[in-house]
Amino acid sequence: MPRLKLTIAYVGTQYHGWQTQARKNASPLPTIQNIIEDAVAHVLGERVHVHGAGRTDAGVHAEAQVAHLDVPESRARMDWQLALNTLLPRDIRIADAVLVPDTFHAQHSAVRKTYEYRLWLSKRYTPPELFPFVWACGSVDVERMGSRSLLGKRDFASLKNAGTDLRTTVRTILSITRTPEGPLPEGCLELTWRFEADGFLKQMVRNTMGLLVAVGRGKLEPADIPGILDACDRRIAPLT
């Protein structure tokens, strides 16, 4: 069957993450995967599994989440972007829909993944339009928040969500960048941290930002980070 690659953007505030979550004797929780599969079923008249590149947690947003599904030959060349966007809620959008070889897999073909985390450096006031998209962490010393010791292939067990059951907690962080770079301009209240890796553990980036913010607040020293990682114990790292 022809394979379709979807690039999906969404505001995750109202959703319980990406993956469908069945409940006994109740309707599934609203998730991105479930909502998209509902729309596909409306088009095809049958339920088709939509494979995502990875799971996202409740409330997480996406600019380019990749997924794939197999569709009948008779429907392969229809305008899937228009068809799905007509059916989907406004906070879930198909940015692109293209046919790909059947060897493509949204998860297994991924070379790297990118995650952004936005900080708002004031607890006094957060603009309402930014509230769902930033962590209002308050004032931090950005110059202390060095992230070099997080780069490379490491065991990130100390920064995974409790209860995560995986074959390995080793991941490779390829780059970490901050916008704006260098000393903050006067009056700057928003920072964006961008992480690129071969993959992420559940809530790994959230917990990493909790660690960096603790350093920025002076609760930890930058030199503490390697020891926290080496401990491979979530209880050692700051709670978020």
Give, region by region, the residue ranges found by the protein language model.
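Structured-RNA-binding interfaces characteristic of tRNA pseudouridine synthases
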Residues: 1-240
